[in-house]
């Protein structure tokens, strides 16, 4: 029953709920009911006001209702707002189109199933959300009502917004989320890789007179960037140009010699093998692949300079690829045009996909927490048709199954008459038989009639019938769909949208070719009416039982042609084996004889690539039939006579057909043209673009009658089966990932059953025919099925996917039958138990975490119970249910309606792996059954290519080894043990998420830090370096606060010890090699150095003790460590640190229980003269500050000087090479040097989440304030958004102390090419060799490695670079230096710029390896633009990586500047401080005095 209530609006800050309702006004309602809320219509308003339903009341339009589940009004709100009936947020009222305090009609909805949403689309940006987080978010939404523009929250954050809801096949404003709803997640902050295929067709004109590459540069890309800008997306874009250059077998490869008349007369004899190493294609021809990075990780908002640069690169791309400089016999370099660009069909399509996917196989390394998703866009002038290598196809399919990367193909051509995208490869079974047939036919060809380098030859002695029989058995090519690819045709959709509606209406009634015809493109306007246009011949489908050449089929066709049954669907379209296929809007009254004459010229057009050849023996005039009866009389005898006539005249054709090797089609083979003519329905790259009348021209389909080809090259006789000439209505073109698309797959024939285990794809026997088969014939195509709400029409451009790429759906609707599981899969079973001592989760929570881990690895939840057959044969026993069946089970368990043992969840990785997780009835165990498909070995392929990186100025040869991830051997048992808590160590095989961060010293310090020292009246006494050291102490406090002790021995923690001491962090100003040397020397001289005791000392002193007693205790065995402390090459003898002294006071004196009390008492002792600061500069501070016992209380004699120089140490002849001697005799010292430690850390500091967000944090034990401090975070079970919030909190806190938190790559930059083939370092050399090192340079302990880079280091310091990571060779061989994550593995020393934008290494040849820090630059670029596309960066941060590189290159290439720099450094070498002040002018803002007095 509907009631009327007054609707109030409120802001989300007032009420936490989107809707609140006074349930007292609706007695039959209860919390949890769904209410339909709609605005009143005109009649209801009139009835309420006693008015007639006339006038303006009828003008009030009835809006779509909104479905909500309002929360009950609390008693407090009832008292404060007694008149409140129903209140919603303002956005819901805008959906209803009503204002505040207006009446609405409210009705309870009894049946929730009618309100269920089929799909709900959630958009998010500027954050990384894993697929496991997506599932958790959807579980929270399940059982609730959602509405458009609703902000959904997850763990306290707002990760996304609902922008689209589908219910009953239509969009709606609101709906109910049930377990059957399919969520779709789309990212507005993804990474895009845009590949532009620069094939031969890129420089071809379309019918509209526009070049293809102009469509890409002036059409598609500007539109794409404009959409991104309008949507406010924050994508990261890289654009790569690629092509394949083929070098012909026949004749010379160099066709142009512009600078050598002499060589031009002789003819070139230079072949590609003489100048470079080319790969060999499937046909045995040499080729090379080229890649050029034009844009590298640029923000999507900064697109105007990107397009300007791209146009320049496109203009010179062809010249850079095919023009070679080759030395002649005189040693002169001559430019030659070598080879030709292949067509799009023969391009390196799969190689591009593999190179893109290769870098994403390790996306768990250097995880960017501000972006989600990766999308690949391939812009091609072709139609999405590719010839590939079978082994490469197998490797690519495996790689795509193991990744969650989406891929879109943008075709600049027209929609073809076959399904795309599609790939084909040689049939390994029939290829041998085909080669034998080719040799037989070639042997019968007269050599005198064969034209060299031509595609024509004389007719063989084979009869027509024998040739047709050979065609019927032809299965040379096998076809399949690439996994996870979508295709959109830009020319037939977006160009239409740029025209006015009137122009579009007029074009619907105009002739529009559905295939590219060379004659039509080349003729003038006046020639269009009289010219003859030839199209290719027909060929039967060899895989079908019948043949269009049979009398029965021909007669049936003739009968249907004139009985109104000619209009057939695309299902009746047969494949064509001609190198091209055409379709034309031919009038209905054109009879068969006229069509035969047009086809009589077709093959000549295809082969020659020029104008139509007219020398066909007896020329036949065009015939026009005006009578249906005369057409019926054209029967078998006429066809036979015509075929014989054409066969007799074909010999006259061959002499007139000539094509040069440079103009030969890329689809045709190099050695023999026979296989090329049998390749199938494909078009030549020069005219590969086809169309299927996308504007809907109405006419009747005419199936042409096949005739004999009158031009037979080595292939003897080629027949083709033509596509429809005209269409009554445009056929339905489907996206490859839609369910209907999967139904087009034909089951494998018996000849291919032996390869069923080895191929992860399904064979398509006829791409022209849409066979109605079951969807489970191609389960791989269903992997992306649930990303689409309806059938995808390929003629509609998929802007949604290219602007906001969708994540891999969480659900999958395929599960193998019991027979398939037994025959094609291997089973692995293990059980995970719950031990309350280690596991703090119950069975359901453990099951949820196990599902999350599998979802994050690309698995999907099986939601098709009909296809899931259990092992016992009962379809219901293994019912995986829907995506939230498990979630619903958890809710039911809380309500007491669940038997735990009934839970069973199935997950799938494509159709290759299936996991079944089932709970036992006890509630402590989970059984895991893994089914791994029996496949052949993974295999590897080496790929050689030429690469032009963004940092280079030429192509450089490179290679990469492709290999699919061996996901079948992933150790899921160990991962499940980690989830249970039985294991804490993360091996590399687990592929856990990891990221490295560095703390860089900033030039300014926040004024907020001074507040800590204002009470001591020493705010102006701390230098910038001292504040940065305080920042490290603050970080140690943060780490210690969130530290997790798995043994729960928190009682053993010492509250009176500083966190830095407890974490073992030490400070030094010496380089690593010098620090190791000093430590070894100190250990040799004093073997009884104090070590931290495992036992807590007993408090034994009272605060009333006299100063002599306290001084004796300080200098005794139980006192703070007193040692010689080195700081900035100054040695402070017999000193102790302030933090250690405060800890000693708190642990020694009775009545002191906190560090604050100890600090206060210590300052009292300082004021009494017991000790003092080494430079008499600071009071007692709890940090890294140096203090010394006063001479009156010191046991050891104390020098009057506060310090002595580190360089003043005397070295005798026996100690001259002390460094090497100490290292070689280090048996007495430590054999293991620990550089970092790891702790388990709870990232959820605020504890908003119900569970512990455990991560592993690695931190440095040794820190030099002049270099970086490193933090490494690793996680497997934690939520990425929680970690991002933690890092943001750390960044805000540490910036107050002059430290900047920057993400940096884990691997050294010299090895970046091993992870990302499109990323290479830039090498910068010095134009002038540096002079010898000054004599007064600092003493070094590794002169072999350190001294040779001394000048390089000075140059880097001059440009504000600081030390990042030492090289592995820095550490002595006698010492085992280890990090908590492994041994040092950097080959070269690495530096980083103070801004964090650039990383540099120094190689063995004293060259600089330069690489921008893209992990940091991408975040800066995201924040550097407002919505108006104006830069908001601080002026100090505008120096980009490109500008830094330009200045650095200019400096290194300028001999005068280098010579001046060397002179300044040499002249200042007498005073080390002058060296640093002159060589580090830009490196530090601190004065020389500050640098010498820091922290002392």
Curated annotation (Swiss-Prot):
Q: What is this protein called?
A: Vacuolar membrane-associated protein iml1
> For this protein, what is any one GO molecular function term?
GTPase activator activity
CDD domains xrefs: DEP_DEPDC5-like (cd04449)
Q: Where is this protein primarily located?
A: membrane
What kind of membrane protein is this, topologically? Peripheral membrane protein
Q: Which organism is it from?
A: Schizosaccharomyces pombe (strain 972 / ATCC 24843) (Fission yeast)
One biological process term in Gene Ontology: negative regulation of TORC1 signaling
Alphabetic keyword roster: Membrane, Phosphoprotein, Vacuole
SUPFAM superfamilies for the chain: Winged helix' DNA-binding domain
Which InterPro entries does the UniProt entry name for this protein?
Answer: DEP_dom (IPR000591), DEPDC5_CTD (IPR045838), IML1 (IPR027244), IML1_N (IPR048255), WH-like_DNA-bd_sf (IPR036388), WH_DNA-bd_sf (IPR036390)
Where are residues bearing Phosphoserine located in the sequence? 738
Kindly give the SMART domains that the UniProt entry links to this protein: DEP
Pfam families, A to Z = DEP, DEPDC5_CTD, IML1, IML1_N_fung
Annotated GO CC locations = fungal-type vacuole membrane; GATOR1 complex; vacuolar membrane
Residues of the DEP domain: 1116-1191
């Amino acid at each position: 029953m509907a009631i009327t209530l007054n609707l109030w609006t409120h802001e989300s800050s007032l009420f936490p709920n989107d809707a609140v309702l006074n349930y007292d006004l609706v007695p039959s309602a209860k919390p949890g009911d769904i209410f339909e809320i709609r605005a009143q219509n005109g009649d209801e308003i009139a009835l309420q006001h006693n008015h007639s339903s006339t006038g303006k009341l009828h003008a009030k339009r009835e809006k779509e209702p909104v479905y909500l589940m309002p929360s009950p009004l609390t008693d407090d709100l009832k008292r404060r707002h007694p008149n409140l009936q129903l209140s919603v947020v303002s956005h819901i009222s805008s959906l209803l189109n009503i204002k505040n305090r207006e009446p609405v009609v409210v009705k309870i909805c009894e049946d929730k199933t009618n309100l269920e949403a089929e799909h709900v689309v959630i958009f998010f940006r500027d954050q990384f959300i894993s697929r496991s987080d997506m599932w958790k978010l959807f579980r929270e939404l399940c059982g609730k009502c959602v509405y458009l523009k609703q902000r959904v929250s997850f763990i306290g954050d707002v990760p996304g917004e609902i922008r689209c809801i589908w219910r009953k096949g239509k969009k709606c404003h609101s709906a109910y989320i049930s377990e059957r709803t399919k969520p779709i997640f789309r990212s507005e902050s993804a990474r895009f890789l845009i590949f532009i295929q620069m094939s031969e067709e890129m420089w071809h004109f379309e019918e509209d007179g526009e070049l293809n590459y102009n469509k890409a540069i002036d059409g598609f890309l500007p539109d794409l960037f404009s959409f991104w800008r309008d949507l406010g997306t924050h994508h990261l874009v890289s654009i790569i140009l690629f092509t394949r250059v083929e070098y012909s077998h026949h004749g010379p490869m160099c066709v142009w010699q512009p600078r050598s008349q002499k060589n031009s007369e002789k003819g070139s004899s230079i072949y590609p093998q003489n100048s470079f190493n080319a790969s060999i294609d499937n046909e045995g021809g040499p080729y090379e692949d080229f890649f050029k990075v034009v844009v590298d990780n640029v923000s999507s908002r900064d697109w105007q300079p990107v397009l300007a640069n791209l146009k320049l690169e496109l203009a010179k791309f062809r010249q850079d690829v095919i023009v070679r400089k080759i030395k002649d016999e005189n040693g002169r370099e001559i430019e030659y045009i070598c080879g030709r660009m292949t067509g799009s069909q023969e391009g390196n399509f799969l190689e591009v996909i593999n190179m893109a996917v290769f870098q994403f196989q390790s996306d768990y390394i250097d995880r960017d927490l501000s972006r989600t998703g990766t999308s690949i866009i391939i812009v091609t002038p072709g139609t999405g048709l590719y010839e590939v290598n079978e082994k490469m196809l197998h490797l690519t399919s495996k790689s795509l199954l193991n990744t969650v990367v989406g891929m879109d193909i943008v075709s600049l051509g027209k929609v073809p008459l076959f399904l795309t995208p599609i790939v084909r490869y040689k049939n390994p079974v029939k290829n041998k038989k085909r080669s034998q047939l080719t040799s037989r036919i070639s042997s019968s060809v007269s050599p005198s009639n064969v034209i060299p380098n031509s595609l024509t030859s004389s007719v063989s002695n084979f009869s027509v019938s024998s040739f047709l029989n050979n065609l019927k058995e032809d299965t040379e090519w096998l076809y399949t769909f690439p996994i996870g690819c979508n295709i959109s045709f830009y020319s037939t959709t977006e160009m239409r949208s740029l025209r006015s509606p009137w122009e579009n209406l007029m074009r619907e009634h105009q002739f529009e070719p559905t295939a590219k015809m060379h004659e039509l493109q080349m003729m003038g306007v006046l020639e269009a009416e009289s010219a003859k246009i030839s199209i290719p011949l027909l060929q039967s489908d060899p895989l079908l039982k019948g043949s269009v050449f049979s009398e029965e089929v021909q007669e049936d066709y003739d009968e249907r042609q004139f009985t109104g049954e000619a209009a057939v669907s695309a299902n009746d379209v047969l494949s064509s084996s001609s190198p091209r296929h055409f379709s034309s809007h031919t009038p209905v009254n054109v009879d068969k004889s006229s069509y035969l004459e047009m086809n009589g010229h077709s093959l000549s057009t295809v082969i020659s690539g020029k104008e139509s050849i007219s020398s066909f023996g007896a020329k036949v005039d065009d015939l026009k039939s005006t009578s249906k009866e005369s057409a019926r009389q054209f029967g078998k005898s006429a066809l036979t006579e015509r075929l014989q006539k054409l066969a007799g005249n074909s010999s006259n054709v061959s002499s007139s057909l000539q094509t040069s090797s440079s103009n030969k089609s890329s689809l045709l083979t190099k050695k023999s043209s026979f296989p090329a003519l049998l390749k199938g329905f494909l078009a030549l790259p020069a005219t590969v673009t086809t169309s299927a009348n996308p504007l809907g021209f109405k006419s009747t389909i005419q199936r042409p009658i096949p005739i004999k080809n009158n031009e037979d090259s080595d292939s003897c006789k080629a027949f083709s089966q033509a596509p429809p000439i005209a269409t009554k209505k445009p056929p339905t073109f489907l996206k490859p990932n839609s369910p209907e698309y999967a139904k087009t797959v034909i089951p494998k024939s018996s000849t291919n059953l032996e390869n069923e285990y080895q191929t992860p794809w399904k064979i398509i026997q006829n791409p022209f025919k849409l066979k109605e088969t079951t969807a489970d014939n191609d389960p791989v195509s269903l992997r992306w099925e649930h990303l689409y709400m309806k059938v995808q029409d390929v003629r509609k451009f998929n802007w949604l996917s290219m602007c906001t790429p969708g994540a891999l759906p969480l659900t999958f609707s395929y599960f193998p039958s019991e027979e398939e599981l037994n025959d094609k899969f291997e089973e692995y079973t293990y059980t995970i138990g719950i031990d309350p001592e280690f596991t703090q989760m119950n069975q359901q929570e453990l099951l949820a975490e196990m599902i999350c881990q599998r979802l994050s690895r690309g698995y999907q939840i099986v939601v098709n119970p009909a296809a899931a057959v259990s092992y016992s044969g009962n379809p219901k026993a293994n019912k995986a249910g829907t995506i939230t069946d498990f979630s619903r089970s958890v809710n039911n368990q809380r309500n007491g309606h669940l038997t735990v043992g009934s839970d069973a969840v199935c997950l799938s990785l494509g159709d290759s792996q299936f996991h079944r997780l089932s709970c036992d009835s006890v509630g402590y165990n989970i059984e895991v059954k893994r089914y791994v498909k029996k496949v052949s070995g993974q295999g590897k392929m080496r790929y050689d290519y030429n690469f032009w990186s963004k940092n280079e100025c030429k192509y450089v040869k490179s290679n990469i080894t492709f290999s699919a991830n061996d996901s079948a051997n992933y150790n899921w048992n160990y991962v499940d043990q980690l989830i249970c808590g039985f294991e804490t160590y993360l091996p590399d095989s687990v592929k856990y998420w990891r990221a490295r961060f560095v703390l860089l010293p900033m030039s300014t310090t926040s004024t907020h830090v001074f507040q800590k020292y204002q009470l001591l009246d020493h705010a102006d006494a701390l230098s910038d370096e001292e504040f940065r050291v305080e920042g490290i102490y603050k970080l140690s406090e943060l780490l210690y606060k969130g530290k997790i002790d798995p043994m729960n021995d928190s009682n053993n923690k010492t509250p009176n010890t500083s966190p830095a001491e407890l974490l073992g962090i030490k400070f030094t100003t010496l380089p690593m090699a010098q620090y190791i040397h000093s430590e070894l020397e100190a250990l040799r001289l004093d073997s009884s150095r104090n070590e931290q005791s495992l036992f807590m000392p007993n408090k034994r002193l009272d605060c009333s003790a006299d100063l002599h007693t306290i001084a004796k205790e300080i200098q005794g065995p139980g006192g703070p460590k007193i040692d010689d402390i080195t700081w900035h090459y100054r040695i402070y003898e017999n000193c102790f640190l302030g933090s250690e002294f405060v800890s000693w006071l708190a642990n020694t004196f009775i009545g002191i229980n906190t560090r604050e009390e100890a600090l206060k008492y210590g300052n009292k002792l300082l004021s009494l003269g017991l000790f003092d600061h080494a430079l008499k500069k600071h009071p007692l501070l709890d940090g890294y500050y140096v203090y010394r016992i006063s001479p009156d209380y010191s046991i050891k004699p104390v020098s009057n000087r506060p310090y002595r120089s580190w360089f003043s140490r005397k070295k005798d002849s026996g100690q001259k090479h002390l460094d090497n001697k100490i290292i070689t005799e280090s048996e007495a010292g430590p054999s293991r040097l620990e550089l970092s430690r790891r702790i388990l850390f709870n990232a959820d500091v605020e504890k908003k989440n119900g569970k512990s967000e455990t991560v592993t944090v690695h931190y440095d034990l040794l820190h030099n304030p002049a270099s970086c401090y490193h933090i490494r975070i690793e996680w497997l079970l934690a939520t990425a958004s929680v970690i991002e919030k933690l890092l943001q909190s750390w960044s805000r806190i540490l910036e107050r102390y002059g430290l900047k938190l920057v993400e940096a790559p884990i691997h050294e930059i010299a090895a970046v090419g091993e992870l990302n083939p499109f990323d290479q370092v830039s090498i910068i050399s010095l134009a002038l060799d540096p002079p010898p090192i000054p004599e007064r340079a600092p003493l070094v302990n590794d002169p072999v490695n350190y001294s040779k880079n001394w000048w390089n280091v000075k140059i880097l310091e001059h440009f504000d670079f600081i030390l990042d990571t030492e090289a592995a060779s820095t550490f002595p061989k006698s010492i085992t230096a280890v990090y908590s994550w492994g041994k040092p593995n950097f080959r070269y020393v690495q530096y980083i710029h103070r801004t964090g934008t650039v990383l540099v290494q120094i190689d063995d040849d004293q060259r600089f390896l330069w690489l921008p820090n893209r992990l940091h630059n991408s975040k800066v670029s995201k924040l550097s633009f407002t919505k108006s596309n104006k830069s908001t960066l601080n002026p100090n941060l505008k120096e980009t990586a490109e500008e830094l590189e330009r200045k650095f290159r200019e400096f290194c290439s300028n001999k005068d500047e280098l010579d001046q720099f060397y002179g300044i450094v040499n002249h200042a070498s007498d005073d080390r401080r002058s060296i640093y002040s002159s060589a580090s002018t830009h490196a530090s803002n601190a004065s020389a005095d500050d640098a010498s007095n820091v922290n002392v």
